[in-house]
Regions:
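Short glycine-rich anion-binding loops that position phosphate/pyrophosphate groups of nucleotides
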Residues: 10, 64-67, 116-119
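Short beta-strand scaffold segments in enzyme catalytic cores
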Residues: 12-17, 101, 112, 118-123
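A glycine- and small-aliphatic-rich helix-loop capping segment at beta-alpha/alpha-beta transitions
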Residues: 19-21, 76-84, 109, 125-130
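Short beta-strand-loop/turn "lid" adjacent to the catalytic site in phosphate-handling enzymes
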Residues: 49-84, 91, 103-104
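Conserved phosphate-binding catalytic cores of ATP/NTP-utilizing and phosphoryl-transfer enzymes
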Residues: 87-111
């Protein structure tokens, strides 16, 4: 079995794929490696994750606050996730990489995320080669859920 985890600041979807290719999703609170301590990440996994832990061979974790821009946070997250699942293979990188791989596959293209925060990139089919760093969902990623909600509440 392997897991593909898609994590933003609001929620994490853990997609467990078994040997027959059947995928089952489980949800926890969001895990943002930059904004959370290793203890708080452990708490989310221990208290909220209800999927299988045994027999997991690989975890592919795509998350906010992960990737080359945040090496220390990514290493911390990888250590906690690996300890929790005890898997032999672990990849922890940006949620933007997940978006680019899902949208573009192995082709070049532009990929975006519009969630609690917003982000975009140019992907060359292998890696992200251009990215304007977002300000973060608190400061105002225009088009994000946080900004749209602020605008709605301001009009009420």
């Amino acid at each position: 079995m392997y897991i593909i985890a898609d994590s933003g600041s609001t929620k994490t979807q853990w997609c467990v794929v078994d040997a027959q290719g059947v995928a089952t999703s489980y949800f926890t609170s969001g895990i943002n490696a930059v904004m959370m301590t290793s203890e708080s990440i452990k708490a989310v996994l221990t208290d909220e994750y209800t999927g299988p832990k045994e027999g997991i061979e690989a975890v592919y974790f795509y998350g906010a606050g992960c990737g080359p821009a945040f090496p220390a946070a990514t290493a911390t997250l990888a250590e906690v996730v690996n300890e929790f699942f005890g898997c032999s293979k672990l990849e922890a990188t940006s949620d933007l990489v997940a978006s680019a791989r899902a949208v573009c596959g192995h082709e070049a293209g532009i990929a975006c995320i519009l969630g609690t925060g917003a982000n975009s990139c140019y992907y060359d089919g292998t890696e992200i080669v251009k990215n304007v760093r977002p300000l973060g969902f608190i400061l105002g990623d225009e088009g994000s859920g946080a900004v749209m909600c602020k605008k709605l509440l301001a009009d009420v």
